[in-house]
Amino acid sequence: MAINIRKTHPLLKIMNHALVDLPAPSNISLWWNFGSLLGLCLIIQILTGLFLAMHYTADISMAFSSVVHICRDVNYGWLIRNIHANGASLFFICVYLHIARGLYYGSYLYKETWNIGVILLFLLMATAFVGYVLPWGQMSFWGATVITNLLSAFPYIGDMLVQWIWGGFSVDNATLTRFFAFHFLLPFLILALTIIHLLFLHETGSNNPLGINSDADKISFHPYFSYKDLLGFFVMIFFLAVFALFMPNLLGDAENFIPANPLVTPPHIKPEWYFLFAYAILRSIPNKLGGVLALLFSIFILMLVPLLHTSKQRSTIFRPMTQIFFWLLVANSIILTWIGGQPVEQPFIMVGQIASISYFSLFLIIMPLTSWWENKILSLN
């Protein structure tokens, strides 16, 4: 009998257990495609970023011009830049859908996998933030100034911390250089953590829509889910191509086509769309330190979700009341995203404050209480 090298070779054996002979639940739906889509996004971002870094100059006198040079003079530089910029948006769409899937089907009960996922989200946000500063446009400069300034809210060490990150007394050349270094380094850290994320996932196996043990009904990942993922790849690449080729600047800010000028403040300073929900929460609290803590907690609250799970069932598929509140949370997050892009005036301030209170209430109070109430109803039968 011929030896199957896929199953015996020390390196290929690891790949085989992760991608070919991996036992997967037979009933996982399209919502389980986003993990592999995120892997594809990461590879696209690293490759396009690598080619952009070859032509980019991390110096405040040349950064903006070097981006213009990439778009005008480098072969397909405009395409690489458009794919990289819109790929980031697509990355965040996939991340948010991946998290929503985890919340809906109770995947957060794999605590190690979930917590590493939250750390990955935080690193992804950090990478996107420092990357947005690199073109050195108006919104790049003022976004960096406003967001880094938030650290000054921390008592005693705040001002020192801000100047340490800036590398001086304002956002300047030292800031841009270190942000470029971080933007180059962090994706590789994300890649390493992704492997650990997968390692913990394969310890327990994938969850499934019913939220029950699927050991009795597993099928191999290849060819069933490898082809299913391939369909997702083509759909995502199609949307990425549509955005990169037909509307590359739709999700960006027009203000960033103006070179950075420390003497002129843009009328509305706002981050990219994928940060707007957290930015709205930050702005809804009048106290600076309170706002910063709420901003951090809006992401790290995800780490509390496994501890706040009070239901006897894992998935929300058989819990209609929890489903209603889950979709309320989705709608609430969309409202926060909209509010984050609006000017700081009434009625947006009030709507933002109500949406921020609702966001935390749904996670901390409403959903755990609803699950407890559903348990009571089930025990009556």
Swiss-Prot record:
GO terms for biological process: mitochondrial electron transport, ubiquinol to cytochrome c. PROSITE patterns: CYTB_CTER (PS51003), CYTB_NTER (PS51002). Disulfide bonds: none annotated. It comes from Carcharhinus plumbeus (Sandbar shark). Component of the ubiquinol-cytochrome c reductase complex (complex III or cytochrome b-c1 complex) that is part of the mitochondrial respiratory chain. The b-c1 complex mediates electron transfer from ubiquinol to cytochrome c. Contributes to the generation of a proton gradient across the mitochondrial membrane that is then used for ATP synthesis. Heme b b566 binds at residues 98, 197. The chain crosses the membrane at residues 34-54, 78-99, 114-134, 179-199, 227-247, 289-309, 321-341, 348-368. Keywords: Electron transport, Heme, Iron, Membrane, Metal-binding, Mitochondrion, Mitochondrion inner membrane, Respiratory chain, Transmembrane, Transmembrane helix, Transport, Ubiquinone. This is Cytochrome b. Pfam families: Cytochrom_B_C, Cytochrome_B.
